[in-house]
UniProtKB/Swiss-Prot annotation:
Gene source species: Mycobacterium sp. (strain KMS)
Location of the active site: 148
Gene: ispH
Residues reported to bind [4Fe-4S] cluster: 34, 118, 216
InterPro entries: LytB/IspH (IPR003451)
Name listed for the protein in its UniProt record: 4-hydroxy-3-methylbut-2-enyl diphosphate reductase
Biological role stated in the UniProt entry: Catalyzes the conversion of 1-hydroxy-2-methyl-2-(E)-butenyl 4-diphosphate (HMBPP) into a mixture of isopentenyl diphosphate (IPP) and dimethylallyl diphosphate (DMAPP). Acts in the terminal step of the DOXP/MEP pathway for isoprenoid precursor biosynthesis.
Protein residues bound to (2E)-4-hydroxy-3-methylbut-2-enyl diphosphate: 63, 96, 146, 186, 244-246, 289
Keyword Iron: yes
């Protein structure tokens, strides 16, 4: 295998050069599972080991078909609403977080709850609560109806307005333009979010920024890696599910960064051979909720089509690990 091409950050927009001619794959690093997804999936696995099936999970634990199907076969039961869980049963809240009303509903049904909310989502929840206490108008940049946005907005429903995209800014009104802050969903396109914020700031010049970045490190890192390789690719394949916000954003980022085409696939079988007509360089990455086994399947399929040379394109090294929820942590010996 050719050596890793370490683009680094901030040099992510530089050209990828590896000295390889002919068909090749540029493989984005980092890709796949982030710390929050790893924690959430392991939470369900540990809950099943500790309590046995069934373990109920409110919403998909993460937005990936393979992961959800695998956990369902192991005994996880996925439900949309809390009242679908039998009284007294165990329920896991997904990585996307829930509104406070969901905790109240669970307590009323005497459910044993395990909260697998990503700590970075919890951070945004805490910001919403803090600024609501100070009576700010909170402009939450995010996708209307996404579980994470519903949960964050639920922390302060009287103070939060969801701003779905840059064009939605025109409809935003606030009580006091000097007490406005923006927060964001953690899985958005960095570029589109900044465009939305730019327009908000034009309208509200004293708009405050979040205390720290709300778009998570993994979302940003995966977008940077795609930006690094996309200019060299005629095609970028993003492994991920259609309901995965961060995976869909990677397709958009690839197209915006110069790839001629970009497609989202759940499995290797989803690759249409006609996509490869006239293509020399294929970029491959995966969303933050995608296990590596699915990427390996895509690489194997591409090798069958003659793309056996794989060059990693590294823009960051991720080492972050989140502690498991206390309810399912291993007992100390």
């Amino acid at each position: 295998m050719p050596p890793t091409i370490n683009m680094g950050i901030p040099g992510a927009s530089s050209s990828v050069t590896g000295g390889v001619s002919g068909k090749r794959v540029l493989l984005a690093e980092p890709r796949g599972y982030c710390a929050g997804v790893d924690r959430a999936v392991e939470t369900v696995e540990r809950a099943l080991e500790k309590h046995g099936a069934p373990v109920y999970v409110r919403h998909e634990i993460v937005h990936n078909r393979y992961v959800v199907d695998t956990l369902a076969k192991a005994g996880a039961v996925f439900v949309e609403q809390t009242d679908e869980v039998p009284e007294g049963a165990i329920v896991v809240f997904s990585a996307h977080g829930v509104a406070p009303t969901v905790h109240v509903e669970a307590a009323a049904r005497n459910l044993k709850t395990i909260d697998a909310t990503c700590p970075l989502v919890t951070k945004v929840h805490n910001e919403a609560k803090r600024f609501a206490r100070d009576d700010y108008d909170i402009l939450l940049v995010g996708h209307e109806g996404h579980e994470e946005v519903v949960g964050t907005a639920g922390e302060a429903p009287d103070h939060v307005q969801v701003v779905d995209n840059p064009d939605a800014v025109d409809k935003v009104t606030v009580r006091d333009p000097d007490k406005v802050i923006w927060l964001s969903q953690t899985t958005l396109s960095v570029d589109e979010t900044m465009e939305t914020v730019r327009r908000l700031r034009e309208k509200f010049p004293t708009l405050q920024d979040p205390p720290s970045d709300d778009i998570c490190y993994a979302t940003q890192n995966r977008q940077v890696a795609v930006k690094a390789m996309a200019p060299e690719c005629e095609l970028v394949i993003v492994v991920g599910s259609k309901n995965s916000s961060n995976s869909v954003r990677l397709v958009e980022v690839a197209l915006g960064a110069g790839s001629d085409a970009a497609h989202l696939v759940d499995y290797a079988e989803d690759i249409d051979p006609t996509w490869l007509n006239g293509v020399t360089t294929v970029g491959v990455t995966s969303g933050a909720s995608v296990p590596e086994v699915l990427v390996r399947g895509v690489l194997d399929r591409l090798a069958e089509y003659g793309y056996g040379t794989v060059q990693p394109v590294t823009t960051a090294n991720e080492t972050l690990v989140f502690a498991l929820p206390r309810e399912i942590r291993p007992a100390r010996s």
